[in-house]
């Protein structure tokens, strides 16, 4: 009986975590900003926060016909994979949820290299 009541309480407390929250404007981490470069001919992961149980839409001006939709989970987090095209730019990236909108400008698509090493 004790195990059943403990299980019941844990389920109830877990359900409380995913209750509907008040409106939260769509937002992105600080690494997504104007003047950024995305790798060409690949898939770029874009993520952020919004109102729980809503949908966020992402449009890159390099492929305006392709609108990517991402569901916002009960914790207010979302993630989408955005296909990138051939090199070029400047482009814009729009992220919106129907009420709030973020527009990132001057985005370039090209080669992104990460170099590291030891300096002596």
Model-based region annotation:
Residues 14-16, 35-36, 81:
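A generic structural signal for short coil/turn motifs at secondary-structure boundaries
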Residues 119-120:
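N-terminal intrinsically disordered, low-complexity segments enriched in P/E/S/T
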Residues 1-23:
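Bacterial Sec-dependent N-terminal signal peptides
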Residues 8-10, 14, 42, 70, ...:
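N-terminal hydrophobic or amphipathic segments with adjacent small-residue motifs
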Residues 47, 53-116:
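Extended acidic/polar, glycine-enriched regions
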Residues 21-52, 107-111, 115:
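Non-catalytic, glycine-rich low-complexity segments
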Residues 12-16, 46, 74:
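Intrinsically disordered, low-complexity segments enriched in small/polar residues
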